[in-house]
Amino acid sequence: MLMKSKRNKVVVLFIALALFSCKQSEEQKLLLPVFGVKHLSNTDTIYHTIGKFALTNQFGETVTEQTVKNKIYVADFFFATCQSICPQMSKHLVEVQKAFEKDDSLLILSHTVNPLHDTIEVLNQYALSYKAIKGKWHFLTGNKLTIYDLAKNDYLVNALEDDGTPEGFLHSELFLLIDTKGRIRGMYDGTDLVQVTKLITDIKLLKKEK
């Protein structure tokens, strides 16, 4: 009876070590951090992910979470008439596009925070001015509150109307790096070329994750 008890303890210990080892192995595969609240479910870690969405791009096409399924993408927020940080951010996204021009697994989603003005036609002209590649760089519009909610609750950044600012809108300067599972893997200052260069490096690193 004593021997049986010892054997049972050994088996339980072995299983516990195996589960711990699997968890360690999974975490070691993550070459970049995961942003957002983490919830533990038994032995699994459940990370914050981008939820479902449906917006319209500069060609009048519907873009949803299915568009970016199993793809890495960079997300940001802007508006077409912005004369402060947006031109610099868009210019830097041109560099990101250029670095992965022939890579269909990398997309860019730029969300307007002024959908009332930024119609499909306006976004199309804006996209042309930055030589955005169709199917790779989507400029998105939709319901204002939906976009603001998406920014705050999914991408964890600011996007809102603000009468206290010269241009009437307040939005984050961050570029968000999203992995194939919809998790936020990096946040970068889109106005800083050094940070944008790091983003490009991190995208290449993220592509090596299994």
Walk through the language-model features, giving the residues of each:
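N-terminal targeting signals for export/organelle localization
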Residues: 1-52, 56, 209-210
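Short loop/turn microsegments at loop-to-beta-strand junctions
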Residues: 50-51, 73, 172-174
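Short active-site neighborhood of thiol/selenol oxidoreductases, capturing the structured segment around
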Residues: 63-93, 109
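Soluble periplasmic/extracytoplasmic beta-strand elements of cell-envelope proteins
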Residues: 76, 109-112, 174-177
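Structural microenvironment flanking redox-active thiols in thiol-disulfide oxidoreductases
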Residues: 90-150
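Sec/Tat-exported extracytoplasmic proteins
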Residues: 97-101, 130, 151-154, 158, ...
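Thiol-/selenol-based redox modules, centered on thioredoxin-like
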Residues: 161-210
